[in-house]
Amino acid sequence: MQYVGRALGSVSKTWSSINPATLSGAIDVIVVEHPDGRLSCSPFHVRFGKFQILKPSQKKVQVFINEKLSNMPMKLSDSGEAYFVFEMGDQVTDVPDELLVSPVMSATSSPPQSPETSILEGGTEGEGEGENENKKKEKKVLEEPDFLDINDTGDSGSKNSETTGSLSPTESSTTTPPDSVEERKLVEQRTKNFQQKLNKKLTEIHIPSKLDNNGDLLLDTEGYKPNKNMMHDTDIQLKQLLKDEFGNDSDISSFIKEDKNGNIKIVNPYEHLTDLSPPGTPPTMATSGSVLGLDAMESGSTLNSLSSSPSGSDTEDETSFSKEQSSKSEKTSKKGTAGSGETEKRYIRTIRLTNDQLKCLNLTYGENDLKFSVDHGKAIVTSKLFVWRWDVPIVISDIDGTITKSDALGHVLAMIGKDWTHLGVAKLFSEISRNGYNILYLTARSAGQADSTRSYLRSIEQNGSKLPNGPVILSPDRTMAALRREVILKKPEVFKIACLNDIRSLYFEDSDNEVDTEEKSTPFFAGFGNRITDALSYRTVGIPSSRIFTINTEGEVHMELLELAGYRSSYIHINELVDHFFPPVSLDSVDLRTNTSMVPGSPPNRTLDNFDSEITSGRKTLFRGNQEEKFTDVNFWRDPLVDIDNLSDISNDDSDNIDEDTDVSQQSNISRNRANSVKTAKVTKAPQRNVSGSTNNNEVLAASSDVENASDLVSSHSSSGSTPNKSTMSKGDIGKQIYLELGSPLASPKLRYLDDMDDEDSNYNRTKSRRASSAAATSIDKEFKKLSVSKAGAPTRIVSKINVSNDVHSLGNSDTESRREQSVNETGRNQLPHNSMDDKDLDSRVSDEFDDDEFDEDEFED
């Protein structure tokens, strides 16, 4: 039941991870330190699920490095991808439009109220001081928004009136600001009167004397999204204010319009009316169709010309004040627009950090923890950042099918807690990392499976050995897109080649144009995979074929790209020879094992601040170029190939040499066969004189047939050797004839005199065996005749092996015994001369054979 529960829980988690609405994950980042101390990094691929984001502040992604908040936040796109946003300089012009984005906005509290210097203050101090104060006020307006404080009197009214005038420029007004002291005093008096009337009007409407300005300011360049909770009461009060000021027919929607570009603007619905409208009609907000854009709203103006006086004098004063202020604000607005056009800021999106930005993160050598948080911790994604030195080689390993025994079952069985990894893989990779190599785990899984993949690699333990830590590089695509590329299209090498080339460019930025794989500089030392696509990916980035290992489902490791693919091994056997395949990395040219750091290739202190570029002169380059791979036991000790443009002359010379060799071999074969036939005839003459009877006739016939066959062979060779016809015989026929006559060219050569002795000995042994077999047959027949008995009787003194079975009668009758003895004696007398004659004949015959078969010393010496 435990396995069932684990399986159900894992399936539910996997199904939820496949859902695009909840898919989240981040890919590990690699930072490479160069000899001059410069840092370069791989992309920050961070993906969140499709959360329901209502506020622009929720798009801000906080980045924590080693549990410390960094000062470089990221922004979340609508698709769930996070990216950095940086301001571009004026010198950057050729940037695609799709990379231009709005800045990162966050929920910030409203700016605190602070007293500001009005342009109307200090009027008696002279014109120069007034101009300085005017510039100071303009700078304040551009930097931060201004807010209306109802409790302020006097100066605040002039400030608000200045803001109101700046928002409603008129085209017809061309008056200049007051320069004399009298004009300034007149403007100041009118401002005070306007402020008093405005405060009296707001008090009658029962607007609160103090508004809550502690709400969040939610502004984004992509659009204005107000806070509904804070703006609800204000909308009601604004409607009541418009009703009291402009009548019952006034609607807030009539003041807000949208232009063709989608910008929201405030317009004057009564612009067709004149300024001298009768009392009771809404006053003129702006003339000549003046509009207010979103920039004006963000500048902080929240109030327009809302006052309306029942008396004519007040209306005249207010009208003159509005004209003066509108002319002043028109001049100021033109200056501000020109200045803003020159200093317009543009923001670009990116997923990489520069050298200066990386140095601000306070990184350490080896492994660093990354955490990405959205909306104050509602969604958190974690990953790792590895800082590596430029001179430490990398060993790549696939995960599915390379660490696991199969692609599919590696996912399924790992969910229920069953170990489905190859034996010895943890021990081998641990030894490789101990020798000073960096381990890189590469897989075509999607970024949403990053957490599950890392947890699986950390859980592998075999006989006390675990896999070493290393970056897990996954596909930045979603799960369905990654599965389609790997399962349906069966092209995982498309992602792997692009990813490895990107990592390689971190080490060698100036070698991107190298096309030849043999000449390509690469930081990768070896690669492990389970398919031919993995081998092709590793070979594309410059890994030699002799260091690309492919493992099958049975645990056999072989080198698939080598021409001699008969090499078979395993992780356990490679672990025994790990120092041969992966020699220890030397960090110092004097001492090879002086490094005491736990991080491969890093100094013991593990800090980036203590880097000294002068020590790189004494360091030795650890990357083995592909040129060194040409001088191995497999490649270097081969016979060099002849570099000749035209091979036709060589083919003709080879054909002539073959013909000459054929002629020589034919002549040698003829002479050898002739000598063998002569010696065979000499050997067969000796038994021909002494053999009698039928046996002698057979031997004579056999000897004569051998001589005839030998003579025929000699004649055939002599005829073929005397008149060789090269024109009618092809090269194939010549080679076949050489093979039939000389044997296989791979066989060991034999000396001619040894062949002659072998032939002579074989003929002699053959003749001797025939003679011995015929003599033995004759003697056996005679022995059987000699020992045969016709009648059975009592046992006698002469006992033979054949007569033992007949000695079964009793010995009771002496007469019978005497008779039997007499008959036996008579029979013995009759047979004895005959047997003696046979023995003499046999001895003489054997002696003759021995005399005939003796070696002739003269013949042997010849």
From Swiss-Prot:
Processing and modification events after translation: Acetylation at Lys-496 and Lys-801 by ESA1 promotes synthesis of diacylglycerol. Phosphorylated by CDC28 at the onset of mitosis, and dephosphorylated by the NEM1-SPO7 complex. Phosphorylation regulates recruitment on promoters of lipid biosynthetic enzymes.
EC number: 3.1.3.4
Motif residue range(s): DXDXT motif: 398-402
Keyword Electron transport in annotation: no
Enzyme's top EC category: hydrolase
Pfam families found in the cross-reference section: Lipin_N, LNS2, Ned1_M
InterPro entries: HAD-like_sf, HAD_sf, LIPIN, Lipin_N, LNS2, LNS2/PITP
SUPFAM superfamilies (UniProt xref): HAD-like
Disruption-associated phenotype: Sensitive to sertraline.
Activity control note: Phenylglyoxal and propranolol inhibit activity in dose-dependent manners with IC(50) values of 1.3 mM and 0.2 mM, respectively. Sertraline inhibits activity in a dose-dependent manner with an IC(50) value of 85 uM; the inhibitory effects of sertraline and propranolol are additive.
Residues modified as N6-acetyllysine: K496, K801
Effect of G80R: Impairs phosphatidate phosphatase activity
Cofactor: Mg(2+)
The protein's name: Phosphatidic acid phosphohydrolase 1
Primary gene name: PAH1
